[in-house]
Amino acid sequence: MNLTQEDEQRLALLRERAAAWDHKNALGEFESNAELDVYNEGIAYPPSIDEMEVGEGRPTLDKILESSIGSDSLPNLEDGPPDQEAAYHEGEMYSTMMTSYMDQDNENMDLSAGPTCSTPQPITGIHHKETINGRVTQMVYIGETSDMALINRLQDEFDVLYNTYPNRNKQGEIVHLIVMWSTPLKPSTRYSLSPAQPPGKKRKIVQHSSNPEPEIVFVPEPTSSEQSLPERQIKAYLQRGIELKGKSAEVPNFKITNETLGFSDANLKLLYPDTSLYPDNPVFILEDVFASTRQLNKIKVNYQLYDPVLPSI
């Protein structure tokens, strides 16, 4: 039997309605006979339950309920239906609580009082504004993280935004957003990436003090007394959290540790261990960025050590 376009549309509507009521047997019968039960409204409806021939093996509502008796997923209705009034007041109380929570001022909001989830969410906020090389920059603090790949992706997006649809502050100045973060080992210290450099030059990590004026960070040159200290004391001196930045330098008895980099153990996959100097306490070297003379008491630290794009091994 050839169906007209109108009949095909009605059949499609019938399929949707039949699927909604889960009348698969009825739908199969309609398609095989190519018959449409069209009412006065011109819409095809599935037949009533009395008109349908349901197979013996087809699950019915009674069978479903019988198999679910005692299930923890169903409410216990032996003592009567749930108290609708109590449920209403409980929902109203929750709604009021959430509305009150969301209406709080952002600065006074207690983030620990809100809903929680298993995956920590970074709390972003404007840290401070400064002018770098004539460009107004706005630091956006994203909280504690050791994921340099995430930081680079965010900064790349901010750079694209600045070059395509730049933001303007209340004074009408074009603002370049800069990612700012802290590390789990140094939660009170703020870091940011230097703005996009000309071709051939790489970004550096900038450390900020709480002022938050930028702080000069450099590789310290040990004094003569420090150079003569026993190896263990020199090692402790280096593990206080010295940040490495600036031009390359040769420092006696110097080894780069995870603490001096300010990263957590989550970033060890980006480094490889070296036990040549301290077999019982391996240090981690940046591959392809760290240049070593492989001499016992002299390690050459390349300024590219602070390039945020760390190699993956």
Curated annotation (Swiss-Prot):
Phosphorylated by host kinases. Phosphorylation play an important role in facilitating trimerization and possibly P-L complex formation. The keyword Repeat does not apply. Residues 189-208 are annotated as: Disordered. It comes from the Viruses. Keywords: Chaperone, Host cytoplasm, Phosphoprotein, Viral RNA replication, Viral transcription, Virion. One of its GO terms (cellular component) is virion component. The keyword Ribonucleoprotein does not apply. One of its GO terms (biological process) is viral transcription. It is found in: Virion; Host cytoplasm. Transmembrane segments: none annotated. Homotrimer. This trimer is stabilized by binding to the L protein. Binds N(0), and N in ribonucleocapsid. This is Phosphoprotein.
